[in-house]
């Protein structure tokens, strides 16, 4: 995989910043607008299993996203079914997170390969956080987008690959934002055509990512593994 000097410089800068701030998430997505086709998705899963990556079981999850970049996550089929029926977080276990771009230029697009490196800042929020409490008070009228996710995760040395089949709220045509709704059923998420998404995420606090140089090698190695599966080739083209 050939990169320009500027692309290499920017990726190096991402890794340097990621290495000194554990709130930062550095990941890579694949395909046009972050989506691959189902055959490519299966090719990637098969390669990761063949190469001995550790498969990590995942429960189905529902991400509920608000316009102010707060994401609620429910996990487990039973809880998801309950939410679909009652549209409330009352008496349900959930996690919450504030997630946004780390800085204005937080995407690096490698158009020749349909790859995007992206940096995001994450902040876990407790149920008692004032921002969460305010949202819960007016939950019935809050604008929301929904992502119903079935995920297969594979972990390697300092890296995790997430392969996700996603049904989600559609975007406004010609824009990058969701068609917000106040209830799950309002946008018929269950009837949406699934999207197939593949992400490579660099993991903090591992012996393979504890210096910027090691983290960069780990990231490029993981991206290369996915690219080989996409290209159906043992050598990167």
Tell where the protein language model's regions lie, with residue ranges.
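Phosphate-end processing signature that detects enzymes handling 5′-triphosphorylated RNA
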Residues: 1-237
